[in-house]
From Swiss-Prot:
Lineage summary: Bacteria, Pseudomonadati, Pseudomonadota, Alphaproteobacteria, Acetobacterales
A GO molecular-function annotation: phosphoribosylanthranilate isomerase activity
Stated name of the protein: N-(5'-phosphoribosyl)anthranilate isomerase
Catalytic activity entry: N-(5-phospho-beta-D-ribosyl)anthranilate = 1-(2-carboxyphenylamino)-1-deoxy-D-ribulose 5-phosphate
CDD domains: PRAI
Amino acid sequence: MVAQVKICGLNSAASVAASIAGGADYLGFVFFPPSPRAVTAQEAASLAAPIAQPLRKVGLFVNPRDGEIEAVLRELPLDIIQLHDVPVARALQLRERLALPVWRSVGIAAADDLPRDSGGVDALLLDAKPRPDAALPGGNGQAFDWSILADFAPSFAWILAGGLTPDTVADAVRRTGAPIVDVSSGVEQSRGRKDPALIRSFLSAVRNA
């Protein structure tokens, strides 16, 4: 079965167009101002205009304040909420209040970090645990040791993220069996600027994995 793909941190019409044309399944927009990939709700709504079902729009939020996600939803109907630096209890509160699927990020550095259950959210995004001095919770081009996923066969939905590129993603899919892969910095020409050619190469590599 071919893994599904999320292209995250989209902030240009060209990157959105390349993602759609290349066959991405999820298109992600970052609503975290410190990120070089951040967009406003209005910018995301304009960029998302060409996106139609079954493609899904994912909004990434980092420890959001009360009302922050709702403010975005008033401009752009998202299909999935992706949460970073949010405890399980808070994630479940948001899931119930927003009535939308929630993906929760989990930092992975070693096998002991692998989750045993989803905690009640719709999927867990397994990303490399950021370094203590990292300014961002993800999108740092950092991978964890995929070999620890060799026997990982959870009953819940999960996504592989962290350090994926067009050159590494096929091997990552083969080694981990990831049902969904998530890329951001791995398809950028410079920090925060997506390269449509790299997006196309990444999507092609996943299809041929």
